[in-house]
Amino acid sequence: MGLDVSVIRGKDLVCPKCGEVISTISMDNVDSGGRVWYPFLESIGYYVPYDKRTEENDWYGKDMKLTEQQTDKLYKFVKKNDPLCSNEIMGLIALARMEGQDVIINADW
């Protein structure tokens, strides 16, 4: 079984009446994969080895909105390790930053 990773550029959909986030709209996404991703996913707390997994840290198949620091870490990781579709991922991150949008990651293994 392989590791499939999606890097998503998105923005929150906010309720005009109460101001709460209703949903996140996906503006663009880039798919990648491979074992090269495991160390990065573990470093941001997305991937947790099975024996250490709890309900709170089980992100399998779920979207994780990255912080600015995690987004910086993602950009540096992609630039250094050159995973599948690295140029597209770096472009997605740059555009998300220019547009003030979120970078979201989702992985299945």
Predicted regions mapped to residue ranges:
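Acidic (Asp/Glu-rich) sequence patches and key acidic residues
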Residues: 1-109
